[in-house]
Amino acid sequence: RVFPEHHAALITLSREEMRRFDFNKGDTEGLVNIPLQMKGVYFSAFLREDTEKDLIRVSLRSQGTFPCNKFAARYFNGGGHLNASGGQYLGTLQEAIRVFEEALAEFNKP
């Protein structure tokens, strides 16, 4: 999903999708970077249900000065570097998507 008003994109992957399409560990490596190739997208997120634990794995990437690390720390119990960060969410994938969408609107407010 693309959020043009926030120059952002979101990719999600559920356990069911991983089972249905026979995903193996490592198959999603680099997936979070793909939306950054789209014109106007400077921030990308990948939310994936963990295959072993009841949590959501969060990968964040950006271009330019968008602070992935601050976004990860504030909303997803994570951290990292300016343009590459990660975290986790203890809840459902749908809840994590809602948090992400609300965070996009809130994060860049003055």
Residue ranges of predicted features:
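Hydrophobic helix-and-loop "lid/oligomerization" segment in the mid-to-C-terminal part
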Residues: 1-75, 80-110
